[in-house]
Structure formats: structure tokens, C-alpha cells
A protein has these predicted regions:
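Long, polar/Ser/Thr-enriched low-complexity segments
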Residues: 1-117
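Charged linear interaction tracts used for macromolecular binding and regulation
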Residues: 73-231
Length: 231
């Protein structure tokens, strides 16, 4: 509220409509209030929500993202988190910032040209996720039987993920320990390969989506062909 001591024609101190008055060096001064920036448009709000969601997912999946994008990050003077956002922002869909959707099969936790492996359908029993892996490429200068196979189990409902190296390209029946809390929840399972030889150290394959798995059940789905971690 503005106050004046000398009538309507005098100066005033305080706010009057969109004008504020004050006394400066003995003079009565008025100036317009600074107006706030225009509210963000609907498109800006939506984009900000999409960035926020993929950023949060990247934090949950960081153990996988760190390994899967490490080689590309070094090659491009970038960060693993930045590359995860770049490769996955398009996986966030929807027109309502409060009801965004996620293309879980389309998520990429790694990126590269390394040849992949053949993966069976994942199954969770208790706290053990099991998946069978077999070599999909003859060893050559780009691949080696010692290449590491990573599996990631992601539970969006709990905002939790477990990722680890479960074995090598040589193949076998591999397991990954997951929290007991995953029971009854939808768990998305991914796999990728990281090179371990002198000619491909650190290089990655692209990510394969192996499907969803719950206790005693599974629903397999893969990218680029049945059971293949692609390069």
C-alpha cells in the first residue's frame, strides 16, 4: 500500500497499482514495477518434464550407463549421463507432462559397434535372475571370448536397477542377484557386451532388450532379432 503525506498531487512511498514510489536523495521518485518473465509455454513445460524424467532414469540406471557409454564418452569428450540423455530422450512420449510414457524396449544403456551375444529369455526366481547366453560372433580382431557380458534389471515402480557383469562371451547360464522387493513388480531386463581384449578393450555393443521378468515368469522381447545383443 502506498502512503502520501501531502495529498494526491504529491509523491508517495510504496506500491500503487503497477507503480512503486520511494524517496531518493530527498526527491520523490516513481517507477514501474519489474514484470516477471512470461510463463513457460506448454511445449517448454513438456520438454522440461521429458528431460527431468530421462535424467531421473539415468540416475537409477547409472551403473549400467557408466559402463555402457564409457568408451563413447571418452571418444567424444562427453559424459555417460549426457550420452544416455542424447540416445534416450526420444523414448519419452506423451503430450501431458503429468502422464509421460516410456518406451522401455527402446532404451539404450550402451552404444557401440561391438558384436553381441545370443541371450535367452530372462527368468526371476526369488532373488535370482537367470539368463542363458551364447556367443553370436566368431572370435576375430573385433571380438574375444573374454568380452564381458552385462545384464541390467530395471524396476521402474521401485525406481531401482541392478546391473553387473554376469559372465563372458564364451557363454553359459548366468545369474544376477536382484532385491527381494522385485517380487510382483514388472522388471525390464537388458544386456550388452563390453570388449576385454587388447584390440577392443572398453568398446561396447548396443543394448538388447530381453523382455520383462517376474518371479517364476518372463515375457521375452529382443531388439534386432530374437535373443541378440547387437553390435
Amino acid at each position: 500500500m502506498a502512503k502520501t503525506n501531502w495529498g494526491i498531487t504529491s509523491g508517495f512511498i510504496g506500491k500503487l497499482g503497477n507503480v512503486v514510489g520511494f524517496n531518493w536523495k530527498g526527491k520523490n521518485v516513481q517507477r514501474a514495477l519489474v514484470q516477471g518473465a512470461d510463463p513457460r509455454s506448454g511445449a517448454q513445460i513438456l520438454q522440461r518434464a521429458r528431460f527431468g524424467m530421462i535424467g531421473q532414469m539415468g540416475s537409477v540406471l547409472y551403473d549400467a550407463v557408466y559402463e555402457g557409454f564409457r568408451h563413447e564418452a571418452r571418444s567424444n569428450s562427453s559424459t555417460q549421463s549426457g550420452l544416455f540423455l542424447k540416445h534416450n530422450l526420444s523414448a519419452i512420449g506423451g503430450t501431458d507432462p503429468e502422464a509421460l510414457t516410456v518406451d522401455y524396449p527402446g532404451l539404450q544403456l550402451s552404444y557401440g559397434k561391438l558384436k553381441g551375444v545370443e541371450c535367452g529369455t530372462p527368468v526371476i526366481n526369488g532373488t535370482t535372475l537367470s539368463v542363458t547366453v551364447s556367443n553370436a560372433a566368431a572370435p576375430n580382431r573385433r571380438t574375444a571370448l573374454t568380452d564381458r557380458v552385462y545384464v541390467c534389471a530395471y524396476c521402474p515402480a521401485l525406481e531401482d536397477a541392478v546391473c553387473g557383469c554376469v559372465g563372458t562371451r564364451a557363454g553359459g547360464d548366468f545369474t544376477l542377484t536382484v532385491p527381494a522387493g522385485y517380487a510382483g513388480e514388472t522388471v525390464h531386463v537388458y544386456a550388452f557386451v563390453i570388449g576385454a581384449s587388447s584390440t577392443n578393450e572398453g568398446q561396447a555393443s548396443t543394448t538388447a532388450y530381453l523382455g520383462t521378468a517376474g518371479n517364476g515368469s518372463s515375457s521375452g522381447r529382443n531388439t534386432g532379432g530374437p535373443g541378440t545383443v547387437n553390435g
